Amino acid sequence: MTKKVSRRLRELQAKVEDREYGPLDALGLLKETATAKFGEAAEAHIRLGIDPKYTDQQLRTTVALPKGTGQIVRVAVIARGEKVTEASNAGADVVGSEELIDEIQKGRMDFDKLIATPDVMPQVAKLGKMLGPRGLMPSPKGGTVTFDVASAIAEFKAGKLEFRADRTGIVHVMFGKASFSPEDLLVNLKALQETIDRNRPSGAKGRYWRTFYVSATMGPSIRVDINALRDYKLTEAA
């Protein structure tokens, strides 16, 4: 069945030409098409030339967005002993040991990011079926399994994001709020591009970036010229 497109979205789509836009032009258009009645996120949707069913073609990493996410991030920490106190002092919103694991098993999910120290991971592993589908399962690659809980808390609250390519090789990631200036969005988008290039899977062959779109949460997709973004010097946006 064909999905009905709203009149609002049709009008916004009419503003977007079928071509690749330069980075700043694309982000200016993203802001222009963010007309929903709530604070929309700025999103990137990137199809990469990888097949994640092969282990050497998987992408899972983190990016530190210099201008932040524009969101308040609630961080939970599962640890033991002095690390519980360290996490509390570092500003974690939820902290606990085995009792927090039990609460999560019973359905507690009032956090956006879960950090665990390596010594509790055998117990945290039993939460996989609950946390995995929500993208909350701690992992070393995601920077969420660490004894340095204070640094991890600070980084995620400041704008560090974990992302991965899905089973079709597409990365969906939020890189700020549509209310940010185009220049601030560009700083974050450049950080994302550099992170994806730096973490290119060893098994990736041929053209790495296949298609690259940005959009507001409820807005139309806007195609971005990846080569122009790669070549962009951030001083040009100043």
From Swiss-Prot:
Pfam families: Ribosomal_L1. The keyword tRNA-binding applies. InterPro entries: Ribosom_uL1_bac-type, Ribosomal_uL1, Ribosomal_uL1-like, Ribosomal_uL1/biogenesis, Ribosomal_uL1_3-a/b-sand, Ribosomal_uL1_CS. Coiled coil: none annotated. GO terms for cellular component: large ribosomal subunit. Keywords: Repressor, Ribonucleoprotein, Ribosomal protein, RNA-binding, rRNA-binding, Translation regulation, tRNA-binding. One of its GO terms (biological process) is translation. Disulfide bonds: none annotated. GO terms for molecular function: rRNA binding; structural constituent of ribosome; tRNA binding. Part of the 50S ribosomal subunit. Binds directly to 23S rRNA. The L1 stalk is quite mobile in the ribosome, and is involved in E site tRNA release. PANTHER family: 54S RIBOSOMAL PROTEIN L1, MITOCHONDRIAL, LARGE RIBOSOMAL SUBUNIT PROTEIN UL1M. NCBIfam families: rplA_bact (TIGR01169). Belongs to the universal ribosomal protein uL1 family. This is Large ribosomal subunit protein uL1.
